[in-house]
Design a protein with these regions (language model features):
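Glycine-rich, aromatic-lined ligand/substrate-binding cores of catalytic
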Residues: 278-283, 294, 306, 310-325
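Phosphate-coordination loops involved in phosphoryl transfer and adenosine-cofactor binding
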Residues: 2-4, 102, 174-175, 300
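Glycine/threonine-rich phosphate-binding loop and adjacent beta-strand/alpha-helix elements that clamp
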Residues: 52, 177, 319-389
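Feature captures the FAD/FMN-dependent oxidoreductase FAD-binding
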Residues: 75-142, 284, 298-299
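Helix-loop-beta segment of a Rossmann-like dinucleotide-binding subdomain
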Residues: 64-78, 116, 174, 260-271
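C-terminal, flexible cofactor-proximal segment of oxidoreductases
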Residues: 7, 209-213, 357-497
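Rossmann-like dinucleotide-binding core of oxidoreductases
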Residues: 6-37, 129, 134-282, 289-292, ...
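Beta1-alpha1 glycine-rich phosphate/pyrophosphate-binding loop at the start
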Residues: 7, 12-96, 205-214
Length: 497
């Protein structure tokens, strides 16, 4: 029998981890507490934050793994299609027989020569098994974080207080006055859905973010903003220049919020933040969504805002993020990684030098889709444990963790392209533009599609160049290798001493 690896969770992270570990000769065993695979994308009420009418805000090209494309031609996919895709992926790689459905993990602890995984299936069936290695792939989007607001527990509106995680449909809110707390993706998606279906909607927020439409000039926005150039620029140029470059892209694509009647965001995109939504700002401009400062107190059905104004509501829906929650880790592991509701000490979100044979997946918070970085993280784990790439230097790992600890208390949100290239470099599969002169523009300013990470390094594919050229040209985005004037100027900035 080969080296046994327990993978906790059979959502996107767990499935792609199993695929790449199996390719390296490991014997992965997935544990999934729900009765079906897919994680959040099952859409099960009370167990996931995905509601039936939800669509992705990332394109089909960047919401897929490298070995299996989506069926059809829709740019943005409904949640049910993502769930079907994950089932196809599991079948394609023969993973379904490796998944124990309806099995929850109650405890993970260190054993004499590996890791002990304690599980429960059914009402009274308990088990404990030893594995050589463990991948924790449950994700970080299970425990909604509703901020403390004085008097919130006394709210008397008939629709009550809930979170976007528990939202299922606009129907119960039809004709009601609804306050939506937050300005991130889920909050704005639900605010727009409610406004379209008969609710009187107010959004309350701490700060105004820039809002990037999902489509800009016919091209998905995640193809334009999450690029390799953005990472190279951040590494080589002054932060203010990168900030201005990204802000210009966002504002040119969708305007600035104050143009629609929303508050004026901070001039710095990094300080304000950015979110994706196609309809939110037009609905603000039409008066179908109103924007208020953050709420400061609640008394009965009445809410007081930061500017002293008050308004009564029938329901409140918070979309204010999640707490990191891994209750099955034993005390030793929790103490080693200093786990709290926000932070987890791990080198590049993955390994801890004092926990050999244990890896974490998908435990960071980012803007942009997770599929591409998750696959690259899975490859790094598989290549490291399989001996394809050198294991991380322990001294460097400790230094990286120390640097991370120094940033505790600061904003933790990162971006998809930064994370993807971090893992690609660690896995040895970052594409080298010098090897592909015919793809230079696409590799710099095009989408970080899964196909580009099969050009060079381990598991490179002979057809990857053609596949990536098609992905970059999709939606009419990059159909020639001639830089635009802005791209040429941006590229020359990187060449400056």
């Amino acid at each position: 029998m080969g080296t046994r690896v327990a993978i906790i969770g059979a959502g996107p992270a767990g499935l792609v981890a199993a695929r790449w570990l199996a390719a390296q000769g490991f014997e992965p065993q997935l544990f999934e507490q729900m009765p079906e695979l897919g994680g959040q994308w099952t859409g099960r009420a009370g167990a996931t934050g995905v509601w039936p009418q939800m669509y992705t805000n990332t394109s089909r090209i960047l919401t897929a793994f490298g070995d299996l494309a989506h069926d059809g031609s829709n740019t943005f996919l409904p949640a049910a299609d993502i769930h079907r895709y994950l089932n196809r992926y599991a079948e394609f790689f023969g993973l379904t027989d490796r998944i124990r459905l309806g099995t929850s993990v109650s405890r993970i602890s260190r054993g004499n020569s590996g890791w002990i995984v304690e599980t429960r299936s059914g009402a009274e069936q308990f088990d404990a098994e030893q594995f050589d290695r463990v991948v924790i792939a449950t994700g970080r989007f299970h425990r909604p974080d509703i901020p403390p607001v004085p008097g919130l527990e006394s709210f008397t509106g008939p629709a009550g207080v809930t979170s976007t995680y528990h939202y299922r449909s606009s129907a119960p809110y039809r004709g009601m006055r609804v306050l939506v707390g937050g300005c991130a993706v889920s909050a704005l998606e639900i605010a727009t859905e409610l406004a379209h279906h008969g609710a009187d909607v107010v959004v309350t927020q701490r700060r105004q973010r820039y809002v990037l439409p999902k489509f800009a000039a016919g091209v998905p926005s995640d193809h334009r903003i999450f690029t390799r150039y953005g990472v190279l620029a951040e590494q080589r140029l002054p932060k203010a220049d990168v900030d201005r470059y990204l802000r210009d892209i966002v504002v040119e694509a969708g305007g600035s919020p104050e143009q629609y009647g929303a508050p004026t965001p901070d001039p710095s995109l990094f300080a304000a933040g950015v979110t994706l939504n196609q309809q939110y700002l037009p609905l603000v401009a039409e008066g179908r969504i109103r924007v208020r400062p953050w709420l400061t107190s609640v008394a009965g059905a009445q809410v007081t805002f930061g500017d002293g104004s008050t308004e009564s509501f029938d329901g409140i829906v918070f979309g204010t993020g999640f707490r990191l929650d891994l209750p099955f880790l034993d005390d030793e592991i929790r103490a080693t990684v200093e786990l709290d509701g926000v932070h987890l000490d791990a080198d590049r979100y993955t390994f801890h030098p004092d926990l050999p044979g244990l890896a974490f997946m998908g435990m960071w918070d980012q803007s942009g889709g997770y599929f591409v970085p998750l696959e690259l993280q899975a490859r790094w784990i598989a290549y490291t444990w399989g001996g394809v790439v050198e294991p991380p230097d322990l001294t460097a790992q400790r230094a990286a963790i120390q640097a991370y600890r120094a940033r505790r208390g600061q904003p933790q949100k990162t971006r998809m392209n930064l994370v993807a290239l971090t893992f690609a470099r660690a896995a040895g599969c970052e594409p080298e533009p010098a090897h592909w002169p015919q793809l230079r523009r696409a590799l710099l300013f095009g989408p970080l599609a899964p196909s580009c990470f099969r050009l060079d390094g381990p598991d490179a594919l002979p057809g990857a160049a053609d596949a990536f050229a098609r992905d970059a040209a999709a939606f009419g985005a990059i159909t020639s290798e001639d830089f635009t004037a802005r791209e040429q100027m941006s590229w020359e900035l990187l060449q400056s001493p």
